[in-house]
């Protein structure tokens, strides 16, 4: 099987903005990723408890369970799961960034999300997060 025909990573995307979530899904699927979506942290944790994902992408600012709370719970469930946090805000607290592997501003989504996913899928040693201001 050639590298080009190998399936790409399975991603879990979590965001309470359903329209944006569908856009993320469609965008990532055009690059060959398998994408499962959840509209809340608890729903995402339930999916992660039953399925294995190569990368988890979570919005920081969500009701019920924030992206930071989700990431902490996800680390308990699957300690090695790579997590990318997204936010429209540039003032995400440092403690939230410390529990994820990468951070991407939503304003830079189109140019920064794919490189972050590829890095997390292919790298054995990553910094705790990368902040794109």
List the model feature ranges, each with a label.
Residues 1-10, 109-133:
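Non-catalytic signal-transmission and effector/linker regions of two-component phosphorelay proteins
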Residues 8-19, 24-28, 56:
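Conserved acidic segment of CheY-like receiver
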Residues 37-46, 67:
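Helix N-cap/capping motif at the beta->alpha junctions
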Residues 46, 68-79:
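Short amphipathic alpha-helix used as the core "switch/output" element in two-component signaling
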Residues 51-57:
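Active-site beta3 strand of CheY-like receiver
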Residues 62:
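Receiver (REC) domain active-site loop signature in two-component systems and cognate sites
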Residues 69, 89-115:
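Alpha4 helix (beta4-alpha4-beta5 surface) of REC/receiver domains from two-component response regulators
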